[in-house]
């Protein structure tokens, strides 16, 4: 049984009526802050629930085109904060993961981290609204040296696909270096002045836990720029 936490949004069997009332008050206060921040310029709706955050987020995703969520840099207590990775893999919607240090997103230059996978194909499709508005789009495949010819063919096809959507993109194929692939693509994006990275999110469920691919895990924990990820 999960412990009761004063700031959490989960009801436990031993929570008193007073505890539950406190949580409802905190949720109401959070709703007030949300509405104040949104202002009257946008049509918004506040929804809340006294449930496990990840489960609630996955459920509410049914009526969303895109989920925007802040990347947490602290140790995660999933009774307080949504498990971003599990939500991405379970919601069936694209996620825009925003580092806490990012205050705005122009998406003038978007880097697409390409692999010829279902997840990457879906990510490109989900990112089309951003790609249409971008001033520059780069599709990059970082691969082993003996895969560069096949990678170039795949990247060229993606560039052609985007051109059919009236999106001008440039293709790049880079040799994978020693170390983290996530660090390499982040470094490329930063050097090129990109502020949005589009990638597939890779993982699978085992024994009721989500097991992530190394690239996905590293991007979720260390990327200093916004990531649009789809599973």
What function would you assign to each model-found segment?
Residues 75-76, 145-150, 176-179, 205:
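Short, small-residue-enriched loops and turns at beta-alpha junctions
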Residues 1, 35-67, 164-197, 203-207, ...:
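Structural beta-alpha unit
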Residues 58, 79, 108, 123, ...:
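Short, well-ordered secondary-structure micro-motifs
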Residues 13-28:
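A short acidic, glycine-rich active-site loop
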Residues 45, 58-141, 221-231:
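Intrinsically disordered or low-complexity boundary/linker segments at protein termini
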Residues 1-14, 90-93, 106-174:
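Small/aliphatic-rich secondary-structure junction motif
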Residues 81-84, 153-156, 186-187, 211-216:
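Charged helix-capping and loop-helix junction motifs
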